[in-house]
């Protein structure tokens, strides 16, 4: 699949700047009590969730293609950070790409959250790196640093440097994602938000798989499951008795 994209490095900086601007405005205007976003991870190929309550800490917020955690998980009930000293729910601002927005809607449908207490900082997600694939190709070599340069992922370690094209090493789900920004539910979103998202079904990947021979399908399945020792062991064990279908 060919992915049309701009300069990912520049896009990341623009998205990060907008996140900081919107977060700062929400805190300054007392529209929210806390911002949930992403900050730099403690190890390469990672990011970490962060809770920001002071305008002075907004610069800790980052956006890069390693922001894989679904922040909607942190809006689950009974998380102490989201309540004040009197047990009242805080007003929350949350950095939301498309998949985070969809997760929030699901929580709202289950009556676990109320959009009256939530303000989404909407962004147009430009894709998340397939960490597992990169780690597999790097092997046992220790990764010390990762960065985006133009449209390439740069991975550095002791005595090595590898370059991976971003469009090829993006998560497969990101490649086919049609809703990159969150929906604007009852005016709960600022920034990049979708008013009436319309998604067209696209099953090209399924058609491609169905067109493969039995041997090609089997090779694809084994490669896909190779990152999970238990899964691939189960599949290979079954093949001993039944053989590939």
Segments predicted by a language model, with ranges:
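Iron-sulfur-associated redox domains of electron-transfer enzymes in respiratory
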Residues: 1-217, 241
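Long, well-ordered mid-to-C-terminal structural blocks that present hydrophobic/aromatic surfaces
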Residues: 215-245
């Amino acid at each position: 699949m060919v992915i049309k994209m701009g300069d990912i490095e520049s896009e990341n900086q623009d998205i990060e700047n907008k996140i900081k601007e919107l977060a700062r405005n929400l805190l300054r205007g007392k529209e929210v009590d806390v911002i949930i976003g992403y900050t730099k991870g403690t190890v390469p190929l990672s990011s970490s969730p962060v809770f920001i309550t002071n305008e002075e800490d907004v610069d800790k917020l980052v956006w890069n293609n390693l922001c894989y955690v679904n922040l909607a998980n942190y809006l689950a009930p009974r998380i102490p950070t989201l309540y004040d000293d009197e047990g009242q729910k805080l007003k929350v601002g949350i950095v939301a790409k498309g998949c985070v927005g969809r997760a929030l809607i699901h929580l709202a449908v289950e009556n676990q959250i109320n959009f009256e207490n939530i303000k989404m900082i909407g962004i147009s997600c430009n894709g998340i790196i397939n960490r597992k694939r990169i780690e597999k190709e790097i092997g046992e070599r220790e990764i010390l640093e990762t960065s985006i340069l133009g449209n390439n992922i740069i991975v550095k370690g002791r005595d090595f440097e590898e370059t991976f094209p971003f469009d090829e090493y993006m998560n497969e789900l990101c490649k086919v994602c049609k809703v990159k920004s969150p929906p604007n539910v009852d005016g709960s979103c600022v920034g990049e938000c979708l008013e009436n998202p319309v998604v067209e079904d696209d099953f090209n990947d399924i058609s491609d798989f169905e067109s493969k021979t039995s041997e090609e399908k089997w090779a694809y399945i084994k490669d896909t499951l190779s990152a999970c020792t238990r899964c691939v062991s189960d599949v290979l064990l079954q093949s001993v008795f039944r053989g590939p279908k």
